[in-house]
Amino acid sequence: MENTINTHQIDHICTDIETFKDYFLGHNYNENMFNNDGTLNKNYNSFKKTGLIAQIFEEHWNDVYNEEKEKIDLYRPNAPLEVNKIIDCHNKNLGCSIYECPECHDMVFIGHTCKSRFCTSCGYKYKLHRVENILETAYNCKHRQIVFTMPHELWPLFFQHFEIMINILFEAVNRTINSILNDTYKTRKKIKKKKKYSSKNKYTPGFFAFLHTFGRDLKWNPHIHVLIAELKMTEDEKICKKWNYFNFDALSKRFQVILLELLSKELGPSFNKTKNEQFKKHKNGYYVYAEDKDFKDFKSGVEYVTRYCGRPAISENRIISYDGNNVTFCYNDHKDEEYHEVTLTAKEFIMTLLRHLIPFNFKTIRYYGFYRKKHKNHDKMILMIDERKHKMRRQFLQYRLSILKFFNRDPYRCPKCNVEMIYACEIIKGG
C-alpha cells in the first residue's frame, strides 16, 4: 500500500495548512479535506457544526459590539475575547487533531475546544469537573442547601462593580454562617452599641458556596447557594459534632446586618441612606431559603447548585426558535412551575447573556471552613471521606469516555470500519 500514510512514523506538529497539505500529497486523503484555494475545509468530516448560541453571536456580535461598545468595555471588558472563543470553538481557527483509519485510510478532524466557561460545550465540561472535585472533597455525611438572596434594590451595585461586590457577598455568607454557629453577633441593636464578642470561633463549619447571577428568566439576580455539612469541628480540633439545627429567621437577619455593614464599609457615607432604607423596608432581614431537609443523594445536590456555575445563562435546548433576527426561549417559573415563552431580538438576547459573563479567573465556587485545602485540619478530616471517592473518577470526564457515556459512540473509532483510528498529526491554532 504505497499511497497510504504510515502514521506510526508521524511525530510532528504541522504549523500551517500548506505544510500539512504538502505532507499528504501523494497519499490517500479525501479530496474534500481542502478548499480550492488550498485552505482547510472546516466542514470536512467531523468538524463540529456551530452551536445555535455561537451562531447567534457570529451573525450579530459585530453589530452589537459597535452599538454598545462603551457599555460592554466598561462592565464586561473580557466579552470580545470570550465571544470570539465560542465562535471558534471546535473549528479550524483553534486548530485540530487528525486521526487516520488504518483500514480505509479516511481521516477525521477533531477540532480543539475554546475552554471558555461562556461556551455551552466547554462550560458544561467545566461544570462536570467542578462536580467531581466537590464530590472528592466532601465528607461522607449529610449536607443541606441554603440560598442567600438580597432585594432587587441592591442588584445594580453588584452589576456595576462585579468583582468587588461579589467578593463582599461571598464574605457576608461566610461570616453569617460562622457567626450563627458561634454567636459572634446577637442582634443589630447590640452591634450598633458596639458590644464586643469573641472573634475566635469555637467551632468551624464546612461548606461550599456557589454564585448564581440569574434566575430561569435570565434576569440579573445575584445570589449564593450553599451546601453545608451537618458537622462542626470543635476548637481543640479533635472532635466533629453533628450540627443539623439552623435557625432560618436568625440567618435572614444576620445576613442582612453583615452584608449591609460590609457594603457600608466599602462604599462609605454615600451608602448610609440606602442602608437605613434597607433596614426599614426589610425588618425581618433578607430572604434566606433553607429547606428543612438534607440531600440524601449528595451528588444530585451538587449537580443542582453547579448547573449555572460553568456555562452561559441558558442552554441551547431551551431555545425554541431563531429566525435570524429574533430568539424565543422558554422557562418554567421557579415559584409555580408555570411555563413561559420569551422573545427577544438577537441584540437583546446577546446583551442579556453578556450580563452574566464572569471575569477572567473569577471563582464562582468557593470552599470554606474545614473544606478549605489550606485548613490546618484538612489532612485529619480527609479520613472521613468515603473510600470510594479516592478513586479517580475524573477519567470519565476525558473526551473519549464522555462521548461514549452520553452518545454511545467512540469518537476514535472509524465510522466505516469500526476499528480504532491512529493519531496522524495536529494543526495548531493560527495554522
Please report, for each region that a protein language model flagged, where it lies by residue.
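Beta->alpha loop/short-helix hinge microenvironment recognizer with preference
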Residues: 1-431
